[in-house]
Amino acid sequence: MKKRQDKIRQMVPSMRRVHQIHFVGIGGAGMGGIAEVLLNEGYDITGSDIAENAVTGRLSSLGGKIFIGHAATNVENASVVVVSSAIKPDNVEVVAAHEKRIPVIQRAQMLAELMRFRHGIAIAGTHGKTTTTAMISMIYTQAGLDPTFVNGGLVKSAGTNAYLGASRYLIAEADESDASFLHLQPMVSVVTNIEPDHMDTYHGDFDEMKRTYVNFLHNLPFYGLAVMCADDAVLMELVPQVGRQVITYGFSEKADYRIENYEQTGFQGHYDVITPAGERIHILLNVPGKHNALNATAALVVAKEEGIGNDAILAALADFQGAGRRFDQLGEFIRPNGKVMLVDDYGHHPTEVGVTIQAARSGWENRRVVMVFQPHRYSRTRDLFDDFVRVLSQVDVLILLDVYPAGEQPIAGADSRSLARSIRNLGKVDPIFVADHGQLPEVVDQIIQDGDLILAQGAGNVSRLSRNLVEHWTKA
């Protein structure tokens, strides 16, 4: 590790007078990833969060000092304090840092500092950025380029969401939720798509969100590269406003890198990509869905345009095991009513839920799709209510859990009971509302049939509930 740190230090100067870096909200995947990279660079890392989780456990095992709970004393020796977007200005540690004149910065500002002396590749978009970031990271690793990467979710092939490489490459997921991706200064930027989400950040104005994405792309140097999805109407509307080289990809006939002949069998997808030079490249993926073909093609475009050969690209994509909680198969289980498959998925926006359902239908045509859905945030449920009603009506059986608030206060009419009523009124599926999470295993056991594909869907604690199901079924 010492030799690696010395090599990196020759390339990336250390931050002047920074010794101890404290993270408030260190248990988040994005925060923990940056903390892990800095820890491996040799900085003294401390952090706090309200509860232990896999991220805090990993950081502790690597030498980080983790506090459970927030206290002013946690920042006493900090040179700088890094805060996640979930941390409020009145947090006791933030207040204490200001009183001690310790710099307080956003997560993306620290990520930007990591990127400043490296060749940065930033992946943004409403959907698909975590998987695309993981795919690019694995291609560069396969090519022997030893990149640093910081992702918002687990890169299964690497067993972590962050890694400190010894090369000049840094591949990072860019966060639009608080517009903090504007701090980044990459050499290559990918935008997968743009849809209304996190609209409080953009004052409820979708045009403001679109302008912010254009500004993000203008953070590229004049010789930089913007990679944009040709299937996304909003992105294609913005292309004329982007004063940088733009290369597009997608199923659209107008795409520079065009996808053809997509087919899916179970978890496996395969298709062709036609390059601008007319080369036909056959891609094999072991993650399902057309949305993953788009993610993989974005990764291919970046790699091809940066001079990586086809062999490394194809091998990395064929070996790609997925990102954490992205159509994550937890297993097949024998129940009294028959054999079922359980899949855990992070998607929490109507579009994400829709492509997950589509992937399930395409790969397992003869199975019922049973969804356990936990809405995430009252504001998102309110803003996208009709879209949720439409997409959730596409499953065969729907179990609805209460909204996961993520720190928000309830909003009238944006709760799961209201959602259930509207879905029921549409007449396609009769939702089952489960208020008591402890009853979920019993409810699921009552409704499942032989061959069912069960999707545990959402960004809250539904993942823990799905693992409770596994434990229940394994013991039973």
Curated annotation (Swiss-Prot):
Pathway: Cell wall biogenesis; peptidoglycan biosynthesis. It catalyses: UDP-N-acetyl-alpha-D-muramate + L-alanine + ATP = UDP-N-acetyl-alpha-D-muramoyl-L-alanine + ADP + phosphate + H(+). ATP binds at residues 125-131. This is UDP-N-acetylmuramate--L-alanine ligase. GO terms for biological process: cell division; cell wall organization; peptidoglycan biosynthetic process; regulation of cell shape. Belongs to the MurCDEF family. Its main location: cytoplasm. GO terms for cellular component: cytoplasm. Cell wall formation. One of its GO terms (molecular function) is UDP-N-acetylmuramate-L-alanine ligase activity. It is found in: Cytoplasm. Keywords: ATP-binding, Cell cycle, Cell division, Cell shape, Cell wall biogenesis/degradation, Cytoplasm, Ligase, Nucleotide-binding, Peptidoglycan synthesis. Its EC number is 6.3.2.8. The gene is murC. It is an enzyme of class 6 (ligase).
